[in-house]
Amino acid sequence: MKKKLLSLLLALCLVMALVPMTAFAEENEQSSKTSITTVDELLQFAKAVDNGEYDDKTDAVVSLDADLDLTGVAWTPIGSVFAADGTLLHYFSGKFYGNGHTISNLDFSENYGKTEYPSFGFFSEVYGAEISGLTIQGKLDVSNSDPVFFGTVAGVAADSKISDCVSDVSFTDTDKYINGTVAMCGYAINSTIEYCQNKGNFSVMKDTSQFWMGGIAGLAENSTIQYCANTGDMTSWTPSSGGIVGQLIQNSKVINCYSTGKIAPLGKGTTDFGGIAGIVGAGTEIRHCYFAGEMDLSQYTATTPYKRLGGIAG
């Protein structure tokens, strides 16, 4: 009987010891949480990131708690302070919860392609971050032509996770010679992108030499893209284009994804155009994916070996 009572007392002490620790953890998370319900609060958050307040702050929680209309705002990406040599000085590394809300009428056009913004998107670059439940709706009409890693959600994502996001952003270049990327995430490095969708149409009508176009990622390095979809159309001169990703390198994977958007390569130069991926590098993998869109070759005049097209990969 004494042993049983002692066991019960020890169990009770253990429970009592755990309760305040759990409460403290919840209180600590709440204390570092930022709620955004207005455009002004979003811009204040962006300024705080630019000031370095979120550098390596992986416990920070930012919650978008309302739909926001950015009509009239000339967008500069969150975390857009770069040194003269192009090194990013400050960045976001916490958790950004979109909670299913939409940021609409986001116009990337005015500041895209300027020298001071080599990475561009809603976020410029994120490191060790989690971004989820966010819908971006807007446009980008190219007016500047410096090289840019452009992603509607993030220009560059390193050691990060992007999930349950939707991009409905049109990208249009009619006469500028551009280099870089266009996708939901421009350049994914050691990252995971899952349960995301691109609805935006991409159109590049000018010849390019080094440009990666993908519905979900432009360039994926040692990253995994899974359970994602593209329904946007792609009309392009770009050399590396895919419904899901422009190019896969270094152990990257695309799993359980599909694309139904129309793809239309242009010109007569070298093109790697695939329904899922433009270029598939050594050691990479595409599994359980399909392309069910139209491939329009009416404006494409390249001949073999410059003409590399495929329903899955270019």
Where are these predicted regions, by residue range?
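A generic membrane alpha-helix/interface feature
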Residues: 6, 20-21, 56
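Positively charged n-region of N-terminal signal peptides that target proteins for export
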Residues: 1-5, 9-10
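C-terminal segment of classical bacterial N-terminal signal peptides
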Residues: 16-24
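Surface-exposed repetitive/solenoidal architectures
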Residues: 24-314
